[in-house]
Amino acid sequence: MPTSTAEQTVHTLEVRKTEEIMAPIDIVFETILEQMGPYNETPDGVSLKMKLEPWPGGRWFRDFENNTGHFWGHVQAIKPPSLLEICGPLFMSYPAVSNVQYRLTEEGGVTRVEFCHQAIGLIPAELRDGVNVNKGWGSLLTRVHEAAVRRFKA
């Protein structure tokens, strides 16, 4: 039986972003996989050493080698080239769970990426304000945009 209890409140977090990219949907989807995996980095350009196993149940994690790292989530759904969905704690070392979705559609040579990150749990205030979370996802989507356009023009 606990000797003391602290009041804990369950909070939510939501980030939604839309990106329109002048590149075919297949190229954009492949670029998302690369940017979520081996090319993932902080907004300051530091590698996050991420691995993404692109199949249902595949892991998404930071690989520090020698059997060390940080589990971020599992691939909940993957339907190339239109959907990537991941669930797990992501970057939070707190009792929380996240769902991240990339939904892609293509029309007239433009791929539209609808991004959504939703989380629920004991999320600390420094994450709930959304500043750093928005900065991180915004940076990743910018890298996806730039890399997909470069790839398409090559």
What role is predicted for each listed range?
Residues 28-32, 60, 75, 86, ...:
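Hydrophobic pocket/interface hotspot
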Residues 33-37, 44-45, 107, 112, ...:
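Short, contiguous alpha-helical
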Residues 11-13, 56, 67, 96:
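Residue-level preference for beta-strand/loop junctions
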Residues 119-154:
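A conserved amphipathic terminal alpha-helix motif
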Residues 17-19, 102, 115-117:
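A structural signal for short, well-ordered beta-strand segments
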Residues 1-47:
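Hydrophobic ligand-binding cavity/cleft-lining segments
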Residues 25, 45-58, 71:
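A solvent-exposed, acidic/Ser-Thr-rich amphipathic alpha-helical stretch
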Residues 50-51, 61, 65-109, 118-121, ...:
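Hydrophobic-ligand binding "helix-grip"
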